[in-house]
Structures are given as structure tokens and as C-alpha cells.
Amino acid sequence: MPSQSANSETTGVTSDAVALWEIVSVVTSALIAEWVVLSFVRQSKLIAAIPILMALGLMLWSHRERGETWRDLGFRKDNFVSACRLLLLPTAAALLVIIVAGWLTNASLLAGNFRSRFLWLPLWALFQQFALNGFINRRAQLAFGKGAKSILLVGIVFSLLHLPNPLLAVVTLLGGFIWAAAYQRQPNLFALALSHSVVSITMALTVSPNLFNSLRVGFKYFG
């Protein structure tokens, strides 16, 4: 019996370590794309995509190895309304703060022009939420369980990926907390992407680009 208990504890520790290693690997790939690749090859987005594709490959492999289905990850519709209800108040509060910030900084109601790239933003938001919550949040839960520790880790990771933009890092830290908490209660990536898209578009349209340095992160922040 003691031997079985020891083996169980060892397996648990190993599983936690692997989950954390997976998080570190994916985050490192994203940071390499933001900082290292773009610092040497500014004009080629295809080259910058290489570490991102490697991270995506690791994520998909990990999901397969752990037997996680797309529904498990949050690509589902049965709890979409419930997830939206969880996100309604924090998203509305975020929109109010953003609009007031735009007004206080003397930006017009539509500080930025509606660009065609905004049409693709929901897909980009869905991908980010898939990586942030469908992968990182789930791995954080394997290491620390549901609750404050794993939610804190998700928020910190999301903020880290938006450095060195200080204001954007703070905003994404708070957003990361909210989305991570909502995901743990109602895992629905479509609802998270909807909230993410609405907040991002509102920020781009109502807040002066100078306040967030045109939402630049990584090496692009400097020019």
C-alpha cells in the first residue's frame, strides 16, 4: 500500500510538472515571435509565424495525448448563453471604462477608423482564447486546480505577452483574470471570443491610438 501511494504521488508530481512545462513552452514560442524573430526580420510575418505554428503543434499534440475533445476545450454551443451571462456585466463595465477613458483623453467617439482587419478580429480573438484558456488555463488547472492560483497564472501569462506596453499589460491582466474565471465556470470559447472582440474593437475605435501605442507589443512597441 505505501508503495502504491508513493507511485500515485510521483505520478501526480510528474503530471503537474509536464503541464507547467507545456505552458512555458507555448509562452516561450510566443515571446520568441514577438521579440526575437521580429527584431531581425521585421518585414516577414511568415517567418514570425514559425514559432507560433510550433506552439500550435504542441498544443494540438497535447490535447490529443490527453484525450481532450474540441467540446472539452470549449468549442461548444450548449453553454453559450450561460457563458455570455457570466461575461455580460464585466464586459459592459470594461466598455464603460474604455469609453470614459477615450472621452477623458479628448479622443473623439470614433478615434480610429473602422478597418477591414476588424472583420477578422473575432477569429483572432477566438484563437487567442483557445490558446489562453483552452490550453493554458486547462494546464494551469492540472497543476494548481481550479480557482485563484490557476486564474492568476492565466492573467499573468496574458499580460506578459502584451509587454512592454504598460497600459495594455494592465488591461490584459484584468481581462485575463475575468476570462479565465468565466472559462472555469462555463468553458465556452465562442463566448470568450465575443467578449474579447467587442472590447478590442471598442478600444480601437474610441481610445486614442497614442494611449496604447496603437496596441503594439513586443519588439514592434519600439517602432
Please give the residue ranges for each predicted region.
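Helix-capping/transition residues at the boundaries of transmembrane alpha-helices
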Residues: 38, 141, 183-184
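Aromatic-anchored segments of alpha-helical transmembrane domains
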Residues: 28-38, 93-102, 155-164, 198-208
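Short, aromatic-rich membrane-interface segments at the entry and exit
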Residues: 42-51, 109-115, 166-173
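Functionally important transmembrane alpha-helices
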Residues: 169-223
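Interfacial transmembrane-helix boundary/kink motif in multi-pass membrane proteins
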Residues: 5-28, 52-53, 67-95, 112, ...
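N-terminal, membrane-interfacial amphipathic/helix-forming hydrophobic leader that caps
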Residues: 1-70, 204-223
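Function-critical hydrophobic alpha-helical transmembrane segments in multi-pass membrane proteins
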Residues: 98-99, 103, 107-160
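Hydrophobic core segments of transmembrane alpha-helices in multi-pass, intramembrane catalytic enzymes
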Residues: 50-56, 120, 171-179
